[in-house]
């Protein structure tokens, strides 16, 4: 199972790619595998503020609906509009095509609370 080393991870199975004071957020390969076939993704609007540990959207699969929890606080600067028409990208390419939001960080120190790839692998039993 892919757990890219350059990313950070939340305990709620979101991945975070850090690019200066902006982060890109998506869900992990492990999470999409647990959810099954993704049929709908609900994301916030551009310029919405999201708060660490609070829901900022949801992913619906044939089995269930799962909330997305913000690993950091900040302002949404971009959403992946392709997921509206192609939610299956979450299953096919969770780390590339299926990024969900880009967020301008409010507090970079929140990144210190996230897991490394090795810590995340340990958490999911890899």
From Swiss-Prot:
Subunit and partners: The glycine cleavage system is composed of four proteins: P, T, L and H.
Cofactor note text: Binds 1 lipoyl cofactor covalently.
Functional description taken from the UniProt entry: The glycine cleavage system catalyzes the degradation of glycine. The H protein shuttles the methylamine group of glycine from the P protein to the T protein.
The organism of origin for this protein: Staphylococcus carnosus (strain TM300)
Pfam families: GCV_H
PROSITE patterns: BIOTINYL_LIPOYL (PS50968)
GO cellular component term, pick one: glycine cleavage complex
Record's keyword terms, sorted: Lipoyl
Domain Lipoyl-binding: from-to ranges: 22-104
Cofactor(s) annotated in UniProt: (R)-lipoate
Any one of the GO BP annotations: glycine decarboxylation via glycine cleavage system
Highest taxon of source: Bacteria
CDD domains in the record: GCS_H
Keyword Nucleus: no
Modification N6-lipoyllysine occurs at: 63
Protein name: Glycine cleavage system H protein
């Amino acid at each position: 199972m892919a757990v890219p080393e350059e990313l950070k991870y939340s305990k709620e199975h979101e991945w975070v790619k850090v690019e200066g004071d902006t982060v890109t957020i998506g869900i992990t390969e492990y999470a999409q595998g647990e959810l099954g076939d993704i049929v709908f993704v609900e994301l916030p609007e551009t310029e919405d503020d999201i708060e660490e540990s609070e829901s900022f959207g949801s992913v619906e699969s044939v089995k269930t609906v799962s909330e997305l929890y913000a690993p950091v606080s900040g302002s949404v600067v971009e959403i992946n509009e392709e997921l509206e028409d192609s939610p299956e990208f979450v299953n096919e390419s969770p780390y590339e095509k299926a990024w969900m939001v880009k967020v301008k960080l409010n507090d970079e120190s929140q990144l210190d609370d996230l897991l490394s790839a090795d810590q995340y692998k340990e958490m999911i039993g890899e």
